[in-house]
Amino acid sequence: LIGHLDTVFPENSPFQKMERLPDSTVKGPGTNDMKGGNVILLFALKALHEAGELTDAQIIVALTGDEELTGKPISLSRKDLIEAGQRSDIALGFENSTGFNNVTLARRGSSGWKVEIKGKRRHSAGIFLTGVGAGAVFESGRILNDFYETLKGETYLTFNPGIILGGTEISYHEPSNTGNAFGKTNVVAQSVIIDGDLRFISEEQKEITRAKMRAIVANNLPETSAKITFFDSYPAMPPTQENKDLLKKFSKVSIDMGHGPVEAWDPSKRGAADVSFVA
């Protein structure tokens, strides 16, 4: 049974305190993602205990503290979670769902990528001439446009350049996703950095997409160079027959209790989660 204790709100966010509302609900950082799921996990175990169903059962509760930003290296930060999954027949993630009549059978994995581009710093009067070339900013535009034209439209695959810096001189602080850039309109850009993410439904889809991105990055405009680096984060949790069989049991229980059938939710509408490491 998997949950997490951290939230997406940084220390400098004004949204920091829990507040009880008059209608018996609460609001605060992490109440939806995923304090509510943690409470359901706890009371499900309480109900099983009161019913005497925990005797001779092996149930592992895993509550991580770095789900929103996974600790590195992943091989260490998720080692215990993976080992717990190997000892279990079924793994359930209590991350917030989309209602009582939907469950998540598949989740996309996530990967980071970074493109670093170099051009020749020259006066802009000579741009496109031999020995000057296109500059780093034009090369960044080519790469991003080729990513868009080549990769968009594939089922469950998304990719996003979240931040870009370009000019004569740039500095980028990755932990905070902030940076500075300096350039002049009459100087051909020397440097560009692009930071983005990639979402995929299977490891095969991830590797095929990475190969296409590498090929695009290598096809440079004159007098420019570029390299792309990938960073693994969450693996994909592809749909499996075992997950579909488990859904049938969930749905039958829901119907028996008068709540109607339970259906699978579209994985393209869900983010990555710790349950994927177990799957």
Q: Residue spans of the language-model regions?
A:
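Acidic/His- and Gly-rich active-site-bordering loop/insert found
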Residues: 1-29, 49-55, 252
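Residue-level signal for short, function-critical loop segments
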Residues: 5, 65-67, 200-202
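Short, small-residue-enriched loops and turns at beta-alpha junctions
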Residues: 8-9, 68-70, 100, 234-239
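Glycine-rich, phosphate-binding/catalytic loops in enzymes
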Residues: 16-20, 78-80, 110
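Short pre-catalytic strand/loop immediately N-terminal to key active-site residues, enriched for Gly-Thr
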Residues: 23-33, 261-265
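Short glycine-aspartate micro-motif
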Residues: 26, 89-93, 112-114
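Acidic/histidine-rich catalytic neighborhood of metal-dependent amide-processing enzymes
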Residues: 34-108, 171-176
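Metal-dependent amide/peptide-bond hydrolase catalytic core
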Residues: 96-97, 105, 112-279
